[in-house]
């Protein structure tokens, strides 16, 4: 047991060269923890507010000195003297002080950085790894589980400067025996894909999340390139490795139509659901994220009725890690999975609440990074602690992405036992 004696924050840079906030929580025992807030590019309209300065003379208006100031003044005054191990009380105190539904006063980035830094400090104080400390915060007895990585090896949409409409084309090494081997599968396929693209005379520059970002004639062309890379790397698509998509459909939903500009196609909700179903028939796709616009609930119902019994349908912009919105989805039988992003909701306690609600309803939970990341690896510990079973943390290059994979490898070695369950994490696969 140890009380907080100091909190400090600073403005640092994320993986896109934009400012973000880093916070330190220092305890009377001498233990401390530091954490950073990530930032998204394609964001849901109902996400908690990321407080930016808006001063165009600094960082093009994206500075976070207001959020830093809130940590160094209001939040510091609020939390100094409180017991660090009472995570719920710390988070609730910040939520009450903010007083808004979207954390618009103090800023979700300020609250989150402190919330995670406090958890890290408490873990150090108690001599526990972070995943063990987070696990202890939950009401149920989860067994640790190493998540199946969902590796984004072709980037499109808002994550790349190319003509590909679907935002993420991912591979999942479901046939690997360990997380270290899953990461090896992914790395080998990533390098094979580079060769495939080079052979076709395509660009092998990478996007925000480390995946390749070539101009391609269609979404199918991206899938075909990945299928070829899987084979060249010596793996079998559908058995060793499956595919996943993040459509980020809100980014190309215009006037009630899904407009694939790269393919010069425009579809209504039912037609787009049919399009996705056809892709699933042709390729071993077992997960689709944001297959409809966040406001197109009727479209989501169509998609869920069409694919929900055989494909994981993940709500990201749809649910924004918010239990109130997730409950509506559960009640209306929309989607069957939720993407979990710390900064969409803004505190560790609320994040754990969303994971629990999803699990209790039979929904899966996919722990996720953001496109604007740092070296912070907390999401790896969160995935293990909650036995979520799946993690999205980008491709197999860029140190901001690889840091999370390396953390998973270290955790697996620490646990010293098999905790990677591969395809068993996908109940729809049987």
UniProtKB/Swiss-Prot annotation:
Which UniProt key words apply to this protein? Cytoplasm, Glycolysis, Lyase, Magnesium, Metal-binding, Secreted
For this entry, list what GO says about its biological process: glycolytic process
Q: Which domain of life is it from?
A: Bacteria
Report the co-factor binding details: Binds a second Mg(2+) ion via substrate during catalysis.
What are the catalytic residues? 209, 341
UniProt keyword Mitochondrion present: no
Q: Which SUPFAM superfamilies match?
A: Enolase C-terminal domain-like, Enolase N-terminal domain-like
Among InterPro entries, the record links this protein to: Enolase (IPR000941), Enolase-like_C_sf (IPR036849), Enolase-like_N (IPR029017), Enolase_C (IPR020810), Enolase_CS (IPR020809), Enolase_N (IPR020811)
- State the pathway, as annotated in the record: Carbohydrate degradation; glycolysis; pyruvate from D-glyceraldehyde 3-phosphate: step 4/5
Sequence positions that bind (2R)-2-phosphoglycerate: 167, 341, 370-371, 392
Q: Which GO terms describe its cellular component?
A: cell surface; extracellular region; phosphopyruvate hydratase complex
Q: Which CDD domains match?
A: enolase (cd03313)
User: Which EC number(s) does the record attach to this protein?
Assistant: 4.2.1.11
- Could you say which cofactors this protein requires? Mg(2+)
Query: Quick one: which residues bind Mg(2+)?
Result: 246, 289, 316
Give the subcellular location: Cytoplasm; Secreted; Cell surface
Self-association and partners:
Component of the RNA degradosome, a multiprotein complex involved in RNA processing and mRNA degradation.
Q: Which HAMAP family does this UniProt record tie to the protein?
A: Enolase
> Tell me, what does this protein do in biology?
Catalyzes the reversible conversion of 2-phosphoglycerate (2-PG) into phosphoenolpyruvate (PEP). It is essential for the degradation of carbohydrates via glycolysis.
Family, per entry: Belongs to the enolase family.
What's the protein here called? Answer: Enolase
Name its species.
Alcanivorax borkumensis (strain ATCC 700651 / DSM 11573 / NCIMB 13689 / SK2)
> From which lineage does this chain's organism come?
Bacteria, Pseudomonadati, Pseudomonadota, Gammaproteobacteria, Oceanospirillales
């Amino acid at each position: 047991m140890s009380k907080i004696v100091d909190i400090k924050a600073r403005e640092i840079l994320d993986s896109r060269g934009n400012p973000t906030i880093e916070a330190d929580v220092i305890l009377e025992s001498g233990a401390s923890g530091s954490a950073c807030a990530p930032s998204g590019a394609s964001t849901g309209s109902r996400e908690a507010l990321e407080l930016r300065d808006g001063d165009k003379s600094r960082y093009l208006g994206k500075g976070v000195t207001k959020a830093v100031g809130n940590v160094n003044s209001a939040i510091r005054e609020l939390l100094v003297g409180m017991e660090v191990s009472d995570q719920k009380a710390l988070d609730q105190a910040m939520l009450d002080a903010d007083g808004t539904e979207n954390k618009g006063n103090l800023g979700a980035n300020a609250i989150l950085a402190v919330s995670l830094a406090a958890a890290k400090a408490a873990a150090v104080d108690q001599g526990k790894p972070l995943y063990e400390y987070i696990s202890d915060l939950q009401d149920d007895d989860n067994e640790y589980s190493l998540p199946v990585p969902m590796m984004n090896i072709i980037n499109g949409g808002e994550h790349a400067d190319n003509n590909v409409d679907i935002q993420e084309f991912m591979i999942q090494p479901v046939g690997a025996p360990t997380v270290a081997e899953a990461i090896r599968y992914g790395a080998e396929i990533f390098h094979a894909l580079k060769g495939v693209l080079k052979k076709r005379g395509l660009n092998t520059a990478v996007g925000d999340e480390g995946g390749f970002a070539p101009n391609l004639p269609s979404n199918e062309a991206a899938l075909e390139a990945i299928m070829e890379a899987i084979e060249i790397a010596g793996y079998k698509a559908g058995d060793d490795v499956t595919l996943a998509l993040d459509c980020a459909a809100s980014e190309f939903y215009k006037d009630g139509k899904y407009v694939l500009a790269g393919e010069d196609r425009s579809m209504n909700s039912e037609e787009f659901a049919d399009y996705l179903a056809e892709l699933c028939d042709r390729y071993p796709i077992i997960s689709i994220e944001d297959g409809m616009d966040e406001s197109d609930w009727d479209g989501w119902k169509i998609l869920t009725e069409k694919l929900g019994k055989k494909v994981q349908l993940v709500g990201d912009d749809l649910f924004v890690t918010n239990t109130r919105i997730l409950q509506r989805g559960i009640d209306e039988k929309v989607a069957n999975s939720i993407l979990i992003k710390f900064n969409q909701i803004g505190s560790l306690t609320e994040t754990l609440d969303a994971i629990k609600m999803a699990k209790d309803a039979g929904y899966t939970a996919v722990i996720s990074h953001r496109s604007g990341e740092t070296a912070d690896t907390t999401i790896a510990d969160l995935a293990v602690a909650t036995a979520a079973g799946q993690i999205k943390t980008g491709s197999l290059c860029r140190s901001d992405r690889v840091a999370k994979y390396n953390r998973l490898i270290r955790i697996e070695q620490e646990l010293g036992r098999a905790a990677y369950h591969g395809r068993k994490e996908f109940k729809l696969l049987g």
